[in-house]
Amino acid sequence: MVAVAGRPAYQPAMHPALAHIVCWIFDLDNTLYPASADLFGLIDKRMTAYVARITGLAPDQAYQVQKSYFREHGTTLNGLMAEYGVDPHDFLADVHAIEMDVLEEDKRLVDAIARLPGRKLIFTNGDEPYARRVLASVGLSESFEAIHDIHAMAYNPKPHPLAYQSMIQAFRLDPSRSLFADDLARNLPPAKALGLTTLWIDNGSEQVGEDSSHAIDYRTGDLGQWLDEIMGTE
């Protein structure tokens, strides 16, 4: 069989319940690598340092402001943009300037994603340059058609409904034939409400609450294993 660019040279035997899926959408952080890597811990420290520089506050006070922005504006970035007119590109480049030596390739996951039939997209609250660094570090730099990042969302991050609507519109997706995987259960209800099939990556980064449990169609602690199982290769 002749291979088509972006598709495997054969079509795996997909589980009947998921045979209708033609677009696979993945969150990035703590979804395509283990939550134990704790990249966000490094990013969080840089966010606090950035807030301290902008506000002139001591680190402990800056941390409190950072978290208040998150609660009141949805993200630290949105708070800084509203209160100080911060350039989002400058902020994101600064806070994402972290080492990624804790990341490594999961060959099983890389191979499983390569075998998935259909389109494959990244949907992240980070920015594209950071996402590309992560993907390169875990062996997935050539695995996805595109990255829908925080700039493309017009700074309305998941779980804001506008984030999902912008993704659907940008790639002309049919929600009823798309699946979205995320490690944060709170990010799944908006996707479910729009008709997407949902997969919760239960890796310890968040425990599911009653307000999210209804929106979980599938659940796994090992994405590579789950993909192998639904394609009949496990």
Residues covered by each model-derived region:
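Asp-based, Mg2+/Mn2+-dependent phosphohydrolase catalytic module
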Residues: 2-22, 114, 127-128, 132-234
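Conserved residues at beta->alpha junctions
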Residues: 30, 122-125, 182
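N-terminal helical cap/lid subdomain that shapes the substrate entry/recognition surface
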Residues: 17-26, 31-110, 118, 129
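A generic secondary-structure micro-motif detector
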Residues: 37, 66-67, 121, 153-154, ...
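Short, surface-exposed alpha-helical recognition segments that flank or form part
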Residues: 1-3, 38, 100, 104, ...
